[in-house]
Amino acid sequence: MSASEAQVIARALFDSLTGTALQALRAAASVNGELTPERVLAALPEDAPREIRNLVMALGREGNLDRLPAVVTAFEQMTRRGGARPLTGEVISAVELNPQQRERITAQLTARYGPDLELRFSVDESLIGGLIIRIGDQVLDTSLRTRMAAIQRNMMTS
């Protein structure tokens, strides 16, 4: 089997499983009136995945069945992205970046990490200059504060 054939089969499986789960979640969220685990479970299709039933029971135990519509919305967004979680990142600068700088940094980082990258920009004047970029568990620190600390460490050890 070629890689492209495997990709087609995997996509069909993913679409089928997420479609079934989404249909069950929508049915659960459509219950009107008093929300009890029993009423919500009764609204589920017979072929609803066990995980959806377990979710309903867990939300019911915690008194959070009213959060089902938010879960449906989040699940719909995830399935539109193919199940991938959005990658989050933070760009910290010593001074406020202008819109052109933000756009350039965003373009470079999304080219490297993908279009689902969600960036947050903030300012930390103690950096003196440069940037700190955190994406996932990766950190790129080009700040003057860090460079000066490295120089100081080198001077102390020599």
Swiss-Prot record:
<dbReference type="Pfam" id="PF00213">
    <property type="entry name" value="OSCP"/>
</dbReference>
<dbReference type="GO" id="GO:0005886">
    <property type="term" value="C:plasma membrane"/>
</dbReference>
<keyword id="KW-0406">Ion transport</keyword>
<keyword id="KW-0813">Transport</keyword>
<keyword id="KW-0066">ATP synthesis</keyword>
<comment type="similarity">
    <text>Belongs to the ATPase delta chain family.</text>
</comment>
<comment type="subunit">
    <text>F-type ATPases have 2 components, F(1) - the catalytic core - and F(0) - the membrane proton channel. F(1) has five subunits: alpha(3), beta(3), gamma(1), delta(1), epsilon(1). F(0) has three main subunits: a(1), b(2) and c(10-14). The alpha and beta chains form an alternating ring which encloses part of the gamma chain. F(1) is attached to F(0) by a central stalk formed by the gamma and epsilon chains, while a peripheral stalk is formed by the delta and b chains.</text>
</comment>
<dbReference type="InterPro" id="IPR020781">
    <property type="entry name" value="ATPase_OSCP/d_CS"/>
</dbReference>
<keyword id="KW-0375">Hydrogen ion transport</keyword>
<keyword id="KW-0472">Membrane</keyword>
<comment type="function">
    <text>This protein is part of the stalk that links CF(0) to CF(1). It either transmits conformational changes from CF(0) to CF(1) or is implicated in proton conduction.</text>
</comment>
<keyword id="KW-1003">Cell membrane</keyword>
<dbReference type="InterPro" id="IPR000711">
    <property type="entry name" value="ATPase_OSCP/dsu"/>
</dbReference>
<keyword id="KW-0139">CF(1)</keyword>
<dbReference type="GO" id="GO:0045259">
    <property type="term" value="C:proton-transporting ATP synthase complex"/>
</dbReference>
<comment type="function">
    <text>F(1)F(0) ATP synthase produces ATP from ADP in the presence of a proton or sodium gradient. F-type ATPases consist of two structural domains, F(1) containing the extramembraneous catalytic core and F(0) containing the membrane proton channel, linked together by a central stalk and a peripheral stalk. During catalysis, ATP synthesis in the catalytic domain of F(1) is coupled via a rotary mechanism of the central stalk subunits to proton translocation.</text>
</comment>
<protein>
    <recommendedName>
        <fullName>ATP synthase subunit delta</fullName>
    </recommendedName>
</protein>
<dbReference type="GO" id="GO:0046933">
    <property type="term" value="F:proton-transporting ATP synthase activity, rotational mechanism"/>
</dbReference>
